[in-house]
């Protein structure tokens, strides 16, 4: 795919959505919508996504809009006006706002998408409201997610340190979780997999370890066994992650003081 600048993408997406709103039945509902571009952090995010958002009250007033009932029932759908360059997702504003308040991974990816979106049409200030909503963090849910990732990666590292025959899937899962937990700890965000490595690269811990993690990935893909220096990289990364966790939550959490926690697994942690 050809490289495209942010300005070019905004111009093309604005032109595309304007053309859509000249068509029946879209021309009758355009004044009630918010339209946003989900700006990609990587050129691999293709086709680009445009979200069209209506309030439930507006949808109820669209007596002749054929998609009305489906949007009200399911909360969102993909429009048949999508093209090879742009995919249109249509949302109920109320349902979308509700999705942002959930704590599962899909909702947290949605939060990331909203935070990184660009307003194309915003007749009712809904884009601003959604961005503000996406920044609100349920601290308990956030801690639970970090705890679950922390304990999962802790278990994998323990297996690696005690078993030279861990499979490739385990190492790949480890690197994915490293990137996930790094973003959660430094930026309180949960990027989609397509942009996860790119986002991890911008973190302080990412700048320190990304090249090393890619080195480990290359060894895995080439079928080589991990050497002691590779395991040392993993343990040093986990030590730094543990320090970030303690800096964020303190060392009073039960899951940080469990007998199987890193305080006990890594001999040089303290």
Predicted regions and their residues:
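Catalytic metal-binding acidic patch
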Residues: 34-91
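Short N-terminal helix-initiation segments at or just after the protein's N-terminus
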Residues: 29-33, 115-123, 255-259
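Conserved NTP/Mg2+-binding pocket subregion across the NTase superfamily
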Residues: 2-14, 69-163, 263-269
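Generic low-complexity segments that are intrinsically disordered, proline-rich and/or Lys/Arg-biased
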Residues: 21, 25-26, 41, 260, ...
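Hydrophobic, Leu/Ile/Phe/Ala-enriched alpha-helical segments that form helix-helix packing faces
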Residues: 17-28, 66, 71, 75-78, ...
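Helical scaffold of the NTase/Pol beta-like nucleotidyltransferase catalytic core
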Residues: 1-37
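Intrinsically disordered, low-complexity acidic/polar segments
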Residues: 59-61, 97, 188
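Conserved nucleotidyltransferase catalytic core and NTase-mimicking acidic/glycine-rich helix/loop elements
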Residues: 133-270
């Amino acid at each position: 795919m050809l490289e495209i600048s942010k300005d070019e993408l905004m111009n093309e997406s604005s032109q595309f959505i304007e053309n859509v709103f000249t068509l029946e039945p879209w021309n009758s509902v355009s004044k009630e919508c918010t339209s946003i571009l989900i700006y990609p952090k990587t050129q691999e995010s293709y086709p680009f996504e445009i979200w069209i958002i209506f309030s439930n009250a507006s949808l109820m007033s669209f007596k002749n809009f054929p998609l009305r009932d489906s949007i009200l029932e399911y909360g969102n759908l993909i429009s048949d006006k999508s093209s090879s360059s742009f995919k249109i997702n249509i949302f109920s504003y109320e349902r979308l706002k509700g999705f942002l308040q959930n704590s599962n991974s899909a909702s947290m990816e949605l939060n990331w998408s909203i935070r990184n979106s660009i307003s194309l049409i915003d007749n009712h200030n809904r884009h601003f409201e959604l961005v503000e909503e996406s920044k609100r963090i349920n601290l308990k849910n956030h801690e639970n997610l970090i705890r679950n990732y922390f304990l999962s990666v802790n278990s994998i590292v323990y297996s690696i340190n005690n078993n030279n025959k861990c499979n490739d899937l385990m190492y790949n899962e480890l690197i994915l979780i490293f990137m996930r937990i790094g973003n959660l700890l430094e930026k309180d965000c949960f990027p989609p997999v397509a942009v996860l490595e790119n986002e991890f690269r911008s973190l302080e811990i990412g700048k320190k370890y990304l090249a090393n993690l890619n080195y480990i990935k290359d060894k895995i893909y080439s079928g080589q066994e991990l050497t002691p220096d590779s395991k040392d990289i993993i343990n040093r990364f986990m030590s730094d992650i543990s320090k970030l966790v303690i800096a964020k939550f303190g060392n009073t959490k039960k899951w940080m003081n469990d007998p199987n926690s890193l305080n006990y697994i890594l001999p040089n942690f303290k």
